[in-house]
Amino acid sequence: TRRSSDLQLIVLISKPPAPGIMQKVLACARQCEKPVVVHFLGADEHSLQYEGVIPALSLRHAAEIAVATLEGKKAPKETSTRESLLAKARDSIGAMAAKQKDIRGVFAGGTFCYEAQLALLAAGLSCESNAPVRGATELRSRQQGTGHSLVDMGDDEFTQGRPHPMIDPKLRNARLLSEGRDPTTAVLLFDIVLGYGASADPCATLLPVLDTLRQEAAQAQRHLLLIAHVCGTEDDPQDRQQQIECLEQAGVLVADSNIEAARLAAFVALQRK
């Protein structure tokens, strides 16, 4: 691979490997003749300080570094949450009922669920998940979240005998409905994943669910904040911009990345403590 004339850069993304394996991977990366951007989710940044290896702090940061490196620019600092999103979140906080304090995350992408947990923990929040990272706890109930809970709907327990939620979102949408109806839920956090093989129009089945949740919350004198991000490119068959616009028209705060969405949710939860 390192001798390929077409290859310009390598990006390594993984959940943190065992220390011994990580050292071997990084030693191999250091020998590459091409730049190597590395993001091991949850790994200590200092453990990635190897000559020839460029550490990234998030999935988005890894992409930003890769683009900058290919353009001959200096590796950028990690992007902060946009003030426009923070302002909209502040407006929503004031409309919430007293019991609304929790983040409920429902993810089709397991890596996004993992990264979101890390973001909550970094903000000083405890959380639970069916796929907990170090520092998080197991779900107390597989059917319904309690406190701040983030569920990976692509986990084996949800996909045995049925399509992955990226392909068929029925089970994911049902979980969104269940978590959004909980009177303690302040933020409903989710992802939309585009690409070949994924649902042809994710928003088509999702929007009725979000509309139902909004109406029920209003009737109960609650305000449910919806936060999402769309993973994909303009070359994907689902039309990324159209999916974003549909979500925004439905009142969803659409972040540029999963890490921005998770940090925005954490910001709200900290204000609701």
Predicted feature residues:
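Glycine-rich, proline-tolerant flexible connector loops at the mouths of alpha/beta enzymes
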Residues: 7, 15-20, 192-200
